[in-house]
Amino acid sequence: ATLRRQRQMCIRDRVMESEDGVLNGLSENKIWLEMSTTDEDEVKRLGNKVISKKAIPLDGPVSGGCHRAATGNIAIFVGGERKAFEKILPALTVMGRKVLHTGELGSASVLKVITNYLASVHLVALGEAWTVAKKSNLDLVKAFKGIAVSSGNSFVHETESQVILNGSYNINFTMDLVLKDTGLFDNLAKKLNAPLEISPKIVEIFKDGQKKYGSRAWSSMIVKRMEDLNKIDFRADGFPDELVDNEPEEKGYEI
């Protein structure tokens, strides 16, 4: 994981800060939008370099899942100067569906890390929920429908439970990426001197999942820890092996 992070930093440095990098191509009033999931400090560090070129920095991570990214049905969080946000809003409403201005530079990256952390918690909880459902001899198709219309529902259940029940686990997002995101959240909490209870355990669980199934295993395979521990599986008929976004296309808008 450390080596991978070092490689990512080298790529980022070359793209942004090399002689022929992005920074040297910026000039007055140009807008730089960082759309990856990264930490607030790094966004602000690069943002200061952008400002030194008299350009305007924004951070704009996206959320909604890979299947929605393929159709543009995603949320975009944007932090930074409001005027710059308004200038690029028409382009953002083509790229995504729901666009939110989150505040100052870096705020969008913080919010994205929070939402990814919540998704990871929901996924781990689903593994335990499906374990109890299976060992209670519930019909897993009916259990899926019941959870989906209940107070226990979540976006993660509506999407990832489908490929879990199918057995493909194919969510197009891998174990190492979840570890990166949960690590960003956990490190942010430490930087803020905010003691947490669940976050360190989530990091530990995904490290174990990476060790068992590999860095490039689908992140949904984290529930397989429960399947293996209990010597069961969560298979059910009628679920897809990969998610497809079937929502009707519509123009994006600010929320």
Question: Model-predicted segments: where are they?
Answer:
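NAD(P)-dependent dehydrogenase/reductase Rossmann-like domain
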Residues: 211-255
